Curated annotation (Swiss-Prot):
Cofactor list: pyridoxal 5'-phosphate
Lineage of the species this protein comes from: Archaea, Thermoproteota, Thermoprotei, Desulfurococcales, Desulfurococcaceae
Record's keyword annotation contains Transferase: yes
Modified residues (N6-(pyridoxal phosphate)lysine): K221
Pfam families with a match to the protein in the record: Aminotran_5 (PF00266)
Family: Belongs to the class-V pyridoxal-phosphate-dependent aminotransferase family. Csd subfamily.
Family matches, as InterPro entries: Aminotrans_V_dom, Aminotrans_V_PyrdxlP_BS, Cys_dSase_SufS, PyrdxlP-dep_Trfase, PyrdxlP-dep_Trfase_major, PyrdxlP-dep_Trfase_small
One GO term of the biological process aspect: cysteine metabolic process
CDD domains in the cross-refs: SufS_like
Molecular function GO terms recorded: cysteine desulfurase activity; pyridoxal phosphate binding
Gene: csd
EC number(s) stated in the UniProt entry for this protein: 2.8.1.7
Catalytic activity: (sulfur carrier)-H + L-cysteine = (sulfur carrier)-SH + L-alanine
Name of the protein this chain belongs to: Probable cysteine desulfurase
Superkingdom field: Archaea
Amino acid sequence: MPRFSCYEVRSEFPELERGIVYLDNAASTLKPRRVVEAMREFSYRSYANVHRGVHRLSMEASKAYEDAHEVVARLVGGSWDEVVFTRNTTEAMQLAALTLAYNGLLRGGEVLVTAADHHSTLLPWVRAARLGGGRARILPLDGRGVPRWDLLEDYITEDTRAVAVGHVSNVTGVVAPVEDIVKAAKKVGALVVLDSAQGVPHLPVDFRRMGVDMAAFSGHKMLGPTGIGVLWARRDLLEELEPPLGGGGTVSRVRLQGGSVEIEWEEPPWKFEAGTPPIIEAVGLAEAANMLMEIGMEHVARHEDELTSHTMKLLEPLYSEGLIRYVGPDKPGERHGIVSITTHLKSPDELGLLLDRRGIAVRTGLHCAHILHDHVDASMGSVWASFYIYNCKEDAERLAEALEEILTTRR
């Protein structure tokens, strides 16, 4: 497959015509024309509720919705019936945590999380562990804000029921050693749940080959629309477990027998998709996934690594002079796609506003990772630049030039 060009794909993104350097991709990516057009065409010509009727429109909509499961499965590995559509990564992680707690799989044990995790990973599993009568155990961080993966064997014990961690940190860009995590967890029979919100959009993944049991990610972080996320889970787990949420679409039959309600659940994934699902959004997500597969996730990952390295090289003078500090590793090869900095000269929000005046969009704040920022003495937050397929080297150069101007100009 020929290598893709960031310059060629930029025409798919009208917002870039405004001259904006968009470096807030870890929060949400821009939407290509083809995704918007696919959703518009479906909305105008084939929309109806799914799995609710035998009329033509419902059948067409149901097929498009089912096909979207197939497309997503091709992107992440596994089969279509291992793909559960949710509202976003946060809801997917809540669903995973509640499902395990509801079915007693966390009872009296521990769930291992890390102090670097996004709140959408940390909070659901802390609460689920409590619901199960157990506790969450926290893997500590090193001085850079990176989990102490070298302590995995000490923190995963016979009491560990699940390990729930971020695939790629949304602050440091550090990629978790999934193979090591799975190996340690399987020794004690613990389940591995991956928050891949920053993984699936940026790296080649095959969850089945990776050996994880569940994984979550969002459409809006990978060229798709808001309002749709994915919980991927092993088919045998989905078959075995009872869903914590019930309602329309989750059951094949409900009967009243002797004063009690008997429930026959649908097959996976439907028994975990309660209520009317995100139908139009599923069409958009499928189109986004197709676009990424056409480009090739290996190319996406390599492109982002090159931009990360180029950016940190350009920022080296500011770093060596002590004008900026990295949150996370200060070596490009140890972080992927995200460069987070702080400076004693400006607050994160002030720096973000000054960059915005120069046409550069970055993210400022605590990035839903308060504990990590507290740990690295950045309680006011940080400023991140995060890259995607439509960012080119010129974007990194504009960022570096703007930061130099802002941080070295005396007022």
